[in-house]
């Protein structure tokens, strides 16, 4: 597809029938860590206007841990996982209660969906998420999505809601993604540095990633920084979805296509939602190293990974977990969902289908990774 102009991309955003908006913890809280009712109400009002004009709106909202640590007596976000998860369990209810009240003023119902990355890398759970979101939107509900911080493990998790929002945008076939943060736009360097310039338009986020100096986590109450937002914009771009990055106070103008923040152009036509989730939803748990012939077949697309072309297996994973497919050089060729547990694969290495069936049984005469569960990188 040809690269659209900035004005064209902003018109795409303004015309979006379905829009996904992500808001970070720091955009919803006071410096003390408590929820800021005024900020939350202002965001709800902006989203409600889009909904009342006939738009379909999905909100991906951080803030459960930030909402919970104040009421539990902590001065700042807890560092250990167990306390974070307990805090999220308290804070998620407080957060949703505020959203229900805020949207209720406009006669709009909200629905909570808590997701873990592990939920979404298996086909059945993935389809359940897709069906639930579609039905909520059909009913005029604003779905409010968050990673299930109370249950997600550090081993398999999104780690931030930026990436989750981009995946959700593809899942609901959104026409725009809006990332709301505590800065008004992307800058060429941290805004406090002399010479830093605001970037109004990014025609190709993939090419631009190496040209912009960004920092890590942006605040004491959130987990993401500008790096994760650029990654989200990249995921959206390769899904054919334009993205706007700006501060929460610009939510309304951003969704209306006004020249605020930074706008990122899509770089591809929309692809398969399922394959995008495999490619980006969760970090791989291990790797299967393949020989040159298998690598060439994988690169050609639409080829399953057969045991006959596999040389080594690394990591500890279960059937259905995401894994890398690596060349002998260590280059990542693809990501896919393993068809077998890591402990089963060594006995399968180098064997063809007939040998697997004869020596190990018919249950092993299947690909290590089926082509429908494989995505090139």
Curated annotation (Swiss-Prot):
GO cellular component, one term: cytosol
Pfam families reported for this sequence: AA_kinase (PF00696), PUA (PF01472)
Enzyme Commission number(s) from the entry: 2.7.2.11
Binding annotation for ATP: 22, 181-182, 223-229
Biological processes, Gene Ontology terms: L-proline biosynthetic process
Broad enzyme group: transferase
Reactions that this protein is recorded to catalyse: L-glutamate + ATP = L-glutamyl 5-phosphate + ADP
Segment forming the signal sequence: none
Entries under InterPro entries matching the protein: AceGlu_kinase-like_sf (IPR036393), Asp/Glu/Uridylate_kinase (IPR001048), G5K_ProB (IPR041739), Glu/AcGlu_kinase (IPR001057), Glu_5kinase (IPR011529), Glu_5kinase/COase_Synthase (IPR005715), Glutamate_5-kinase_CS (IPR019797), PUA (IPR002478)
Keywords on record: Amino-acid biosynthesis, ATP-binding, Cytoplasm, Kinase, Nucleotide-binding, Proline biosynthesis, Transferase
Ranges where the PUA domain occurs: 285-363
GO molecular function terms listed in the Swiss-Prot or TrEMBL record: ATP binding; glutamate 5-kinase activity; RNA binding
Pathway assignment: Amino-acid biosynthesis; L-proline biosynthesis; L-glutamate 5-semialdehyde from L-glutamate: step 1/2
Binding site for substrate: 62, 149, 161
Domain of life: Bacteria
Subcellular location field: Cytoplasm
PANTHER family per record: GLUTAMATE 5-KINASE, ISOPENTENYL PHOSPHATE KINASE
NCBIfam families given in the database record: proB
Similarity comment: family membership: Belongs to the glutamate 5-kinase family.
Function (record text): Catalyzes the transfer of a phosphate group to glutamate to form L-glutamate 5-phosphate.
Protein name (record): Glutamate 5-kinase
Gene: proB
